Amino acid sequence: MISELEPFYERVLARPGIVLLLGGIDAGKTTVAVELLRRGLANGHSVALVDADVAQSTVGPPTTVGLRCPGPDELTRESLRVADELSFAGTITPRGHLLPLVAATSTLVAAALARGCDLVVVDTTSFVSGLYGQLLKYHKLQLTRPDYVLAFERGGELEPLVGIARRFTSAEVVEHNVRTDLPARTVEERMIFREEQFAAYFAAGVSRWKVKPSVFMPTLPPEFDLALLDGIVVGMEDGRGSCAGIGVLEYDDAQNVLRMVSPVTHGVRGLRLGSVRIATDGKSRGPVDFRNLFRTD
């Protein structure tokens, strides 16, 4: 893989900019992203990884888009896990959540540029098929304005997206053929990996404190049943457009109060409700449908 991409690497290093990676499940996007970072650092560039894969996160916990601006000794999985900035998308699937995912991604690309990074690699989700896959990637392309698009092509699945990138952006679009005989992780394996990521995040140590019903976005209606929020993942917003981390809401039936469970203990001004429920051991408790939760259209 590396040798086939050598000409691409050379062009990027000669004229660094924003590189957006497109590809399906287990196509090798993250491996190439880290290689780009490594080569960029070796050539004296200031590099950044914007990890927009909210389900199989490399930077930060699932449900977030993460920004990492690593140094030469910070390219291990463990080092990349620690985000320099987070933006809360609130979901582990792009379907039905295109706006928060696109907004979070573009916010962190802008943050990377503001930090002075001249090589920014954007790793995206494997949601590449169908109408909504095209809409998601189109709007990401429009808002991130990449200089390069690297498409990990496997069996023609990216042909519509490659066409969109070539017609609607000024980016250099490169297709990289991925072997079709390589086994991909199963749905169960991907779920286990995600649950392990959640568990590791909360294993770092958590605090519990009471939460006022007035701090949420969306705003809770009068007489809202707080028990309905039990287990929901929330983004802990700092009031300056960034996310300090995530937490899980815990409802105390005996006292009729909500508590926040999170390793984050300060710098939080508001809580954004996510669209997934989990236990603090990382186990999934299912999705959240806002229309049913708020009984509205």
Indicate residue ranges for each PLM-predicted region.
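Preference for solvent-exposed, low-hydrophobicity sequence contexts
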Residues: 1-15, 21, 39, 45, ...
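Nucleotide-state-sensitive switch-loop elements of NTP-binding domains
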Residues: 2-22, 48-121, 128
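The conserved Walker
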Residues: 25
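Conserved lysine of the Walker
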Residues: 29
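Hydrophobic positions on the alpha1 helix immediately C-terminal to the Walker A/P-loop
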Residues: 32, 36
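Hydrophobic/aromatic ligand-binding patch that stacks against planar heteroaromatic rings
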Residues: 39, 59, 139-140
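Short, structured secondary-structure boundary patches
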Residues: 69-73, 143, 171-172
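Phosphate/Mg2+-binding loops and adjacent switch elements
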Residues: 111-169
